[in-house]
Structures are given as structure tokens and as C-alpha cells.
Curated annotation (Swiss-Prot):
NCBIfam families: GTPase_YsxC
Alphabetical list of CDD domains matching this protein: YihA_EngB
Official protein name in the record: Probable GTP-binding protein EngB
GO cellular component: cytosol
Organism of origin: Buchnera aphidicola subsp. Baizongia pistaciae (strain Bp)
SUPFAM superfamilies xrefs: P-loop containing nucleoside triphosphate hydrolases (SSF52540)
Lineage of producing organism: Bacteria, Pseudomonadati, Pseudomonadota, Gammaproteobacteria, Enterobacterales
Binding site for GTP: 56-63, 83-87, 101-104, 168-171, 201-203
């Protein structure tokens, strides 16, 4: 039997398509544009296309990660005062694909009522948004996973929403701490689900961008049904 007879052409075509999709989406991420800011997700939610939401504690670096992903320094405005951003910012990757950036939760200088409102807004969004394809939760690698993070994770798991947990600011710690924190966080996530993806990230050093793009590409893949 010749070697050519053993080639899995279907698998090769699948690999080529995945590669082409990655190239396409990379270009799209770099041309992402700001769509709008909203205060009430229930009144202004979208009923078409696909979305991925970014959530995390204040000062975890959400805006910096979106800027790194899109290769645009000023797309997502970075506030010098953590907790300052109080609106949901929506960015369009294409006419059918969106990134949703929520206000950071839990900052001490924000009143309890506002902090509670933000948490309720996230929980409400996870429950009602049928276009949501995945949730990116961002944490500071130097800080432990907080209670609010666990509440969001629990809700997302119960709703079968895919999760990517990014340990951001990895450049702030040593390699040994990076490995230790990555291992311990992955172990902890097993208490919630076997399908939570945990990765290291540094928006400053631009480390982890390709892994983030790969996960988003999978969530936004062409075989996913568009919300209508």
C-alpha cells in the first residue's frame, strides 16, 4: 500500500480550514471597532450575531487585554482610577461578532450599591443573553481567586457557558510563581468543572495573545449558529 492511500484528506482539509480561519480572525481582531456603551443590558441587548464577554475584578487589566488582542492601544479606554468605568462597552469584530467589556467589580472606592449593581448586571447578562458564546474571566496572577469570581464561574458553569480564565500580569512574578499559580488555579477550577481553560497572560509583554485568539476563534467558529 502506498503512503498516499493512508492520508486522511478530510483531516487535512479541517486543519487547513482552521489555519485559514485563524488568519482571518486575526485580521478581524485587529480591525475591531468601538460600537457603543450601554448602561442597561436588558433594554439594549442584541438579538443577533455572536458575543464573548470579558469580566473581572477592577484593576485586573481587562481593557489592556482587549487592546492587546486587537493590537490597538486606545480601543478600550484604560482608567487610571480602578472602578471608574461604569458602562458596558461593546466592540465589533465583524458585523456579526462582538466583544462585551463589563465594568470591573469589587473595587473599594466604589460604593456598595454601585458594586452590587454591577454584579447583578453581569448575572443578568449571563442569564438572558442567548448570543453569548463564551466568558473570559480576568484575574491578577498576584491575587487569589475572589468570591465574586467564584460566583460568576458557578453561574456560567450552571448555564453551560464556556470559560477562559486568564491569569494576567504574569510578567510581575517569577517563572516559578507562574508555574505554581497556573497549576494551583487549574486544580481549583476542577472543583467547578473539567472544562474551564486556565492560561497565563501578559498584556504588557503580549504573552498569551495567540492562545486567547485560538479560544475565541473556536467560540466564534463558523459552525456555531448565529443568534437571531
Amino acid at each position: 500500500m502506498y503512503l498516499v492511500d493512508t492520508i486522511d484528506y478530510q483531516k487535512i482539509c479541517c486543519i487547513i480550514k482552521t489555519f485559514e480561519d485563524n488568519i482571518l480572525f486575526q485580521k478581524n481582531y485587529h480591525s475591531t471597532w468601538f460600537l457603543k456603551s450601554i448602561a442597561n443590558i436588558q433594554k439594549e441587548k442584541y438579538n443577533y450575531g455572536l458575543e464573548v464577554a470579558f469580566v473581572g475584578y477592577s484593576n485586573s487589566g481587562k481593557s489592556s487585554i482587549i487592546n492587546a488582542l486587537t493590537n490597538q492601544k486606545k480601543l478600550a479606554k484604560i482608567s487610571r482610577t480602578p472602578g471608574r468605568t461604569r458602562l458596558i462597552n461593546i466592540f465589533s469584530v465583524t458585523s456579526e461578532i462582538r466583544l462585551v467589556d463589563f465594568p470591573g467589580y469589587g473595587y473599594a472606592q466604589v460604593s456598595r450599591s454601585i458594586s452590587k449593581k454591577w454584579k447583578e448586571m453581569i448575572f443578568q447578562y449571563l442569564n438572558i443573553q442567548k448570543c453569548l458564546q463564551g466568558l473570559v474571566i480576568i484575574t491578577d496572577i498576584r491575587c487569589p481567586i475572589k468570591e465574586i469570581d467564584e460566583l460568576v464561574i458557578n453561574l456560567a458553569v450552571s448555564l453551560n457557558i464556556p470559560i477562559l480564565l486568564l491569569l494576567n500580569k504574569m510578567d510581575k512574578v517569577t517563572r516559578s510563581i507562574q508555574k505554581s499559580k497556573l497549576f494551583s488555579t487549574r486544580e481549583k477550577m476542577l472543583n467547578f468543572s473539567n472544562n474551564i481553560n486556565v492560561e497565563l497572560f501578559s498584556s504588557f509583554k503580549k504573552i498569551g495573545i495567540h492562545k486567547l485568539q485560538f479560544v475565541l476563534n473556536n467560540w466564534f467558529s463558523s459552525d456555531k449558529k448565529l443568534c437571531q
